[in-house]
């Protein structure tokens, strides 16, 4: 019986082409960074690409930065372990992303420009609610920094696992290598480089997610592979088996998080015009649906693949790595490993840039002042670059000793943003009665409920399954209630809010 490490190490040692393919991929990313470095003369260009991004880059960069290593490693591993029932999460995510394009994207693109040309979510909240004391901006900025540092560390864990599994290299070496490349092109190239590389990486990811399950089926039993998977364990192809109502709701509820994920909705803020969003939506949702179905297919075919090839799979989340190395020529295998790196690094780079934006725009600018920011753009761009480096170092330190699955790490951070920001974004875009006190209270209560649920409530799931509910649900509900109630009880905003909301609505309706 082959162990994953020995089989793959022998194969990679014998085929240097794999290394060449990875090296070429890294070189392309670094060249892109240098190419777009000149387009980062001011803070808006470095952080938001000057709001000049087209629909196709918007679509694939949003998808690539959203899915991360979770789509290629986490989801196939979950399907391999639990069967088709893990697909509920893909249904929830696809529906959430689709609604996001309709409900959030157009208004956010228009409103952020109208509200003082805000380039970060906290900056938008501040301008939307006339937060002269910057309380809302500081708290929302802190939430971004804390949760994104945790989120980014999950990407570094994925990178370390990849090099450890595929090449038999030390986990820490892989972690540092991935970190270096991501930091390099984010540090120098800014938002435009990140968006272009995400587009490029999104294409690679899609090809990989279609290719691997098809070739696996061709090498197994064709469409009969699914019959074999069901024969091994009937529940493997049952969408409901093994899941309670609480389990289904928990997986489905991942879609709630989309409205408040800063690294995703910033893509809507940077598109050239809200009129381009329908094109972006059609491509983005199609890419997502095909990619997620491919990931599910990898997991299902993997159930038959592992015993057929006598492989001892020690970590289900490395299933895609194993299949790509065993089934393909080293050059193609190298391309597929590049797809995993694409998934990992596209998300890390987007998260680093959003966190850097928050540290620079929401904190450093408060210290240096608005006038200084207008007169010395180079200083602020440099602070943005240094912030990328600082956040990455902290995330690497946390990832140095991984102690959880990629899916759990991503899930915790996703819930944190979903409960903190999703209700607030929706209220800010649609409700004239939202107040600063309501926004702060709802945002903080949502974040606290998520933290408390993870730390103290979820461990009680063995007592009653309700305690195992995905933390985004109680966090989202509490945030909505608190935001609404506190807003009703506090001083109403000025008439300018209703005027702005009406203006945003009218602009969005323009064809």
From Swiss-Prot:
InterPro entries: Na/Glc_symporter_sf, Na/Pro_symporter, Na/solute_symporter, Sodium:Solute_Symporter. The chain crosses the membrane at residues 16-36, 53-73, 84-104, 138-158, 173-193, 199-219, 239-259, 285-305, 326-346, 380-400, 409-429, 437-457, 466-486. It is a multi-pass membrane protein. One of its GO terms (molecular function) is sodium ion binding. Belongs to the sodium:solute symporter (SSF) (TC 2.A.21) family. PANTHER family: SODIUM/PROLINE SYMPORTER-RELATED, SODIUM_PROLINE SYMPORTER. Catalyzes the sodium-dependent uptake of extracellular L-proline. Since most S.aureus strains are L-proline auxotrophs, this transporter may aid the bacterial persistence during an infection of tissues with low proline concentrations. This is Sodium/proline symporter. It comes from Staphylococcus aureus. The gene is putP.
């Amino acid at each position: 019986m082959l162990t994953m490490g020995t089989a793959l190490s022998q194969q990679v040692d014998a085929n240097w082409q794999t290394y060449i393919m990875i090296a070429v991929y890294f070189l392309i990313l670094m060249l892109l960074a240098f190419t777009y470095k000149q387009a980062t003369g001011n803070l808006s260009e470095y952080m938001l690409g000057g709001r000049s991004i087209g629909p196709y880059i918007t679509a694939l960069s949003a998808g690539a930065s959203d899915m991360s290593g979770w789509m290629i490693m986490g989801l196939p591993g979950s399907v391999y372990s639990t069967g088709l029932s893990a697909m509920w999460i893909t249904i929830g995510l696809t529906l959430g992303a689709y609604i996001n394009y309709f409900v959030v994207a157009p208004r956010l693109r228009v409103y952020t420009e109208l509200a003082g040309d805000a380039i970060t979510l906290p900056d938008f909240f501040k301008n939307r609610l006339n937060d002269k004391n910057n309380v809302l901006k500081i708290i929302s900025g802190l939430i971004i920094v804390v949760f994104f540092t945790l989120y980014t560390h999950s990407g570094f864990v994925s990178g370390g696992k990849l090099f450890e599994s595929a090449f038999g290299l030390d986990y820490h070496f892989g972690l540092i290598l991935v970190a270096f490349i991501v930091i390099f092109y984010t540090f120098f190239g800014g938002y435009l480089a990140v968006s272009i590389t995400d587009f490029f990486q999104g294409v690679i990811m899609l090809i990989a997610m279609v290719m691997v399950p098809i070739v696996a089926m061709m090498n197994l039993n064709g469409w009969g592979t699914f019959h074999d998977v069901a024969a091994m364990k009937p529940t493997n192809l049952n969408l409901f088996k093994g899941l309670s109502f609480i389990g289904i709701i928990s997986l489905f509820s991942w879609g709630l998080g989309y409205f408040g994920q800063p690294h995703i909705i910033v893509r809507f803020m940077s598109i050239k015009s809200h009129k381009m969003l329908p094109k972006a939506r059609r491509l983005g949702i199609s890419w997502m649906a095909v990619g997620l179905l491919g990931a599910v297919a990898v997991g299902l075919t993997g159930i038959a693949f592992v015993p057929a090839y006598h492989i001892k799979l020690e970590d289900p989340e490395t299933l895609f790595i194993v299949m790509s190395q065993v089934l393909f020529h080293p050059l193609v295998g190298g391309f597929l490993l590049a797809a995993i790196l694409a998934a990992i690094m596209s998300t890390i780079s987007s998260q680093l840039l959003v966190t850097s934006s928050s540290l620079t725009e929401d904190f450093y600018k408060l210290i240096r002042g608005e006038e200084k920011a207008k007169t010395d753009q180079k200083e602020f761009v440099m602070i943005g670059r240094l912030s990328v480096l600082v956040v990455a170092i902290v995330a690497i330190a946390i990832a140095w000793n991984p102690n959880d699955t990629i899916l759990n790490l991503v899930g915790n951070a996703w819930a944190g943003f979903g409960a903190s920001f999703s209700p607030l974004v929706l209220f800010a875009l649609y409700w004239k009665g939202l107040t600063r006190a309501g926004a702060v209270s709802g945002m903080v209560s949502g974040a606290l409920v998520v933290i408390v649920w993870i730390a103290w409530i979820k461990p009680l799931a063995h007592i009653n399954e309700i305690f195992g509910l995905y933390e985004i649900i109680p966090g989202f509900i509490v945030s909505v209630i608190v935001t609404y109630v506190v807003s009703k009880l506090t001083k109403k905003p000025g008439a300018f809010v209703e005027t702005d909301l009406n203006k945003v609505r009218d602009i969005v309706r323009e064809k």
